[in-house]
Amino acid sequence: MGKYFGTDGVRGIANSELTPELAFKIGRFGGYVLTKDKERPKVLIGRDTRISGHMLEGALVAGLLSIGAEVMRLGVISTPGVAYLTKALGAQAGVMISASHNPVQDNGIKFFGPDGFKLSDEQELEIEALLDSEQDTLPRPIGKDLGQVNDYFEGGQKYLQYLKQTVDEDFSGIHVALDCAHGATSALATHLFADLDADVSTMGASPNGLNINDGVGSTHPEALAAFVKEKGADVGLAFDGDGDRLIAVDENGQIVDGDQIMYICAKYLNEQGRLKHQTVVSTVMSNLGFYKALEAQGIKSVQTAVGDRYVVEEMKKNGYNLGGEQSGHIIFLDYNTTGDGLLTALQLVNIMKVTKKPLSELAGEMKKYPQKLVNVKVTDKQEAIANEEVQRVIREVEEEMAGNGRILVRPSGTEPLVRVMAEAPTNELCDQYVERIAAVIRERFGA
């Protein structure tokens, strides 16, 4: 990753790291890179509910107008909503202002190309080079050649109309509990499920600019689990701040994670003959129980590095149509170009309706292996992982597991940590395996 762009756009503390000055430049230079071949290019901008969203939007808009772009403001909308509308409205680029599941003080900016996909590494590097250049030599249109800004707040409704076409059934007779994380889906989700005749109970849908992700949403599903039981709902659906993730809760208040949701959708699509190449794409963090459950259904799997962008890359490259992460980013490439919480929620409830099975039964077919993750602070993460003694103890543990468990040792992408993860039939074995490896890393490379 570059100096500004991480795995999911530019992120930082709003007004401290991600300043309006930087946002102006990102709008100007990013807009130029994405639209330089087009006269009067059209660029869409959406944002989540953070207090800093207005400030950054104003700066971004100014940067885009300064290179002659026509800007359409979508207002508060989910990240996948921006991705869909960028392509559907024939825009040259889309921009989302959000820091997803991060706390309120953070914010971020991510771009989509005209095809609705996130930018390539090459495009990001081109924008970074302009951000780092000492002089701004880009064109400065004047008079009638300057860009203009218009509001298109109906964009959210256009996106919801599209989503409704992805399911055949209405949801009458199903009681759905929603947790919108006080974020981008706060207005969208209730409308969507009510339009499909579900009985809807909603929490986490009163954004005030400061409460996004605060004890609610897909990173705090325990709040929704209690709400489901209180309301007697059939299913709970928790989104994150920008609406690109879904974590579900069954009728008993049990959490159903991204692996389980992927398994349920993969099995259903496969039975319908709609799972391309009978394959699902996941990351190395997916649970061993996920792979074993897929195998039992005759479904193949492909693994990528952690990050939904790598899942999407693999799907595009080899023509797969279902992939995702344990964290709840699920990608249905037949319908959208990025992880989409609302879309995933629709597919999941549709499967419940068609199969007439409760979520506990659908999710129960996948037996999750106990998982233990330990972070070890180190002086040199790459050296720690490559170390011969560390590799020897990893091999030793893997031999003992004999295929009935899994070890994953990887560096953190952002911190001086090595993450040691084990999956095994019991919690005790998980603890033993992780500690044996972590102890060797600590002894030799502990910070």
From Swiss-Prot:
This protein's GO CC annotations = cytosol
EC id: 5.4.2.10
Describe its PTM?
A: Activated by phosphorylation.
The residues the record assigns to binding Mg(2+) are: 100, 240, 242, 244
Pfam families per the UniProt record, alphabetical: PGM_PMM_I, PGM_PMM_II, PGM_PMM_III, PGM_PMM_IV
List keywords of the entry alphabetically: Isomerase, Magnesium, Metal-binding, Phosphoprotein
Q: Relay the cofactor remark from the entry.
A: Binds 1 Mg(2+) ion per subunit.
What cofactor does this one take? Mg(2+)
The answer to keyword Iron applying to this record is: no
Active-site positions on this chain: 100 (phosphoserine intermediate)
Q: State the reactions this protein catalyses.
A: alpha-D-glucosamine 1-phosphate = D-glucosamine 6-phosphate
Stated role: Catalyzes the conversion of glucosamine-6-phosphate to glucosamine-1-phosphate.
- What this protein is called in its record is Phosphoglucosamine mutase
Q: Which gene encodes it?
A: glmM
